């Protein structure tokens, strides 16, 4: 593809996102759809825009994103992580600001597995004394 393109991979829960950044007018395309069409919820859109707003690049970069797996919140988090990594590849001086905001660290929280003998991960069956 283009020479002046920067790449970042982001993950969150069971979602993974591939983010390509290049200088442009501020278009954000996710799985061949616009940000507004892909994410119906405003909170998810805010999460995606967070790293760009932090470094004042909202209207200066075009983003092409493919994301797979998980739900809305996980995908939004994965995209945010991917954008952060791509921005660091684009300009290493942004790393400290992004680190302070907490976008660089991968959120390792995921669903706890269901255990044998329990109803859910921690929910026990009802106990009857008599």
From Swiss-Prot:
It holds the Pfam family Ribosomal_S9. Keywords: Ribonucleoprotein, Ribosomal protein. One of its GO terms (biological process) is translation. It comes from the Bacteria. One of its GO terms (molecular function) is structural constituent of ribosome. Residues 116-130 have a biased composition (Basic residues). GO terms for cellular component: cytosolic small ribosomal subunit. The keyword Ubl conjugation does not apply. Residues 110-130 are annotated as: Disordered. Belongs to the universal ribosomal protein uS9 family. HAMAP family: Ribosomal_uS9_B. This is Small ribosomal subunit protein uS9. It comes from Proteus mirabilis (strain HI4320). The gene is rpsI.
